[in-house]
């Protein structure tokens, strides 16, 4: 069964696939997935329940998807009304929620047709913000950016102190779950990259651009050359999980499969520049984030682009970034002002912005033959934080929750509301 079909938009927001995510209690989980498998069979009415531990390859290989993601404690299945009622009433089940479609949280002036509304909105808002900067928001005063790209460095690497850090990310594994990577890109030559696709019928090759750009920011070329450096943790090991298709969208099931694969493949940090404009917390993503932290893995996600601050709308952090156990990253511009599109904290538990990173007019890799591009979004801020997390992890050995605290404690305080920027601007280790 393909994961890409959609059948409607629900009252709580987001596009639904018609399937459900069943979050199992910890009592069913362990080294033996037999109890969880039996419970899922009973709850769904399925005669045969495939566990992710049954698969010799990664989930999604050869079109085979597990019903049970054993490491995350989440099952994915269609439920009729009777089984849905029974699952929601079962004490072994923490939650049952509809499966949604998530989208890349950015926009690009060079992207092709078929992009989502959220994708295009991110670029439109960013473009409006840059225009407002140029004219001083109508006040007749031009704004001079505090940072700017140079021939040697992007403004984002300068603003976050990456240029002064001695760490390179060596020995740290960063998984980027996105639209894949342009595996032919010369800037990634010489790297040993493990790439997997969790999108039916599509290879890990990035035909969209978003994943290549985010991977470029998080890591970039293995050895920064004579051109402008844009990658943060250039010696980190990269895992590429294609969880969003060439149209920039993907299902919860595919994304959760990617998270589980990243954890079991040894990732220390998982970077996810994706989401949906849904304010309620997803129990499935919260369970995944919590179990990742328990395993010493930090998941970092883009806060969202649903704000239009110039029109008085501050937006809200969407799923999955609003999960209490997933770090949410907002965006600032080169003057360290909050980006017009960057979502603010919401009142739901976990719905706060934890950090901000460079997210306006960010220069990074782009699929060939273009090679590079500058685009905007909280998607661009997220991999800055993920790459810097790798630098800190290399320096201190911090993992999981300890690494989360390291990032927030070392952030640069900004003269902006904490609801917009959290602990402040993510900063690389200093001397």
Annotated model-derived regions:
Residues 15, 206-212, 248, 375-387:
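Short glycine/threonine-rich catalytic loop with a Thr-x-Gly-x-Asp
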Residues 28-29, 83-84, 100-104, 180-183, ...:
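Solvent-exposed loop/turn segments at secondary-structure junctions
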Residues 178-180, 297, 318-394, 398, ...:
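Extracellular S/T/G-rich loop segment that most often corresponds to the catalytic His/Ser-adjacent loop
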Residues 68, 229-233, 240, 259, ...:
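C-terminal subdomain of the subtilisin-like protease fold in secreted/lumenal serine endopeptidases
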Residues 14-25:
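Short glycine-/aliphatic-rich beta-strand segments at the starts of folded cytosolic domains
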Residues 21-22, 76, 173-176, 216, ...:
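Structural recognition of the beta-strand scaffold that forms the well-ordered cores
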Residues 163-194, 202-253, 265-269, 279, ...:
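Subtilisin-like serine protease catalytic core
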Residues 4-11, 52-151:
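Autoinhibitory propeptides
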């Amino acid at each position: 069964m393909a994961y890409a079909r959609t059948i409607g938009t629900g009252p709580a927001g987001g596009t639904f696939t018609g399937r459900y995510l069943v979050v199992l209690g910890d009592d069913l989980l362990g080294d033996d997935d037999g109890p969880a498998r039996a419970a899922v069979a009973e709850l769904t009415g399925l005669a045969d329940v495939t566990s992710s531990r049954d698969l010799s390859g990664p989930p999604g290989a050869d079109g085979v998807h597990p019903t049970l993601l054993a490491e995350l404690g989440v099952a994915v299945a269609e439920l009729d009304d009777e089984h849905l009622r029974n699952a929601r009433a079962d004490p072994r089940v923490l939650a049952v929620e509809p499966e949604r479609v998530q989208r890349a949280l950015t926009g690009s002036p060079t992207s092709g047709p078929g992009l989502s509304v959220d994708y295009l909105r991110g670029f439109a808002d960013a473009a409006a913000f840059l225009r407002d900067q140029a004219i001083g928001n109508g006040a007749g005063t031009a704004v001079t950016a505090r940072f700017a790209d140079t021939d040697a460095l992007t403004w984002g690497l300068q603003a976050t102190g990456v240029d002064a850090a001695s760490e390179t990310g060596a020995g740290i594994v960063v998984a980027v779950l996105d639209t894949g990577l342009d595996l032919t890109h010369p800037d990634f030559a010489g790297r040993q990259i493990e790439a997997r696709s969790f999108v039916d019928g599509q290879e890990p090759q990035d035909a969209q651009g978003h994943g290549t750009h985010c991977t470029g920011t998080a890591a970039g070329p293995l050895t920064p050359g004579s051109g402008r450096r844009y990658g943060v943790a250039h010696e980190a090991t990269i895992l590429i999980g294609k969880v969003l298709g060439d149209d920039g969208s993907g299902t919860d099931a595919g994304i959760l499969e990617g998270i589980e694969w990243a954890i079991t493949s040894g990732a220390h940090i998982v970077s996810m520049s994706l989401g949906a404009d849904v304010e309620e917390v997803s129990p499935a993503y919260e369970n995944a984030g919590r179990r990742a932290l328990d395993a010493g893995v930090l998941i970092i996600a883009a806060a969202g682009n649903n704000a239009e601050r110039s029109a008085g709308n501050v937006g809200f952090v969407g799923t999955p970034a609003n999960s209490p156990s997933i770090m949410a990253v907002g965006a600032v511009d080169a003057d360290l002002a909050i980006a017009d599109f960057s979502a603010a904290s919401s009142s739901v538990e976990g719905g706060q912005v934890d950090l901000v990173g460079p997210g306006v007019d960010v220069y990074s890799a782009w699929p060939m033959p273009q090679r590079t591009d500058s685009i905007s979004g909280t998607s661009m801020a997220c991999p800055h934080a993920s790459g810097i997390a790798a630098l800190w992890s290399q320096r201190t050995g911090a993992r999981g929750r300890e690494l989360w605290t390291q990032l927030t404690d070392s952030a640069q305080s900004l003269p902006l509301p904490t609801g917009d920027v959290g602990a402040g601007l993510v900063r690389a280790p200093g001397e």
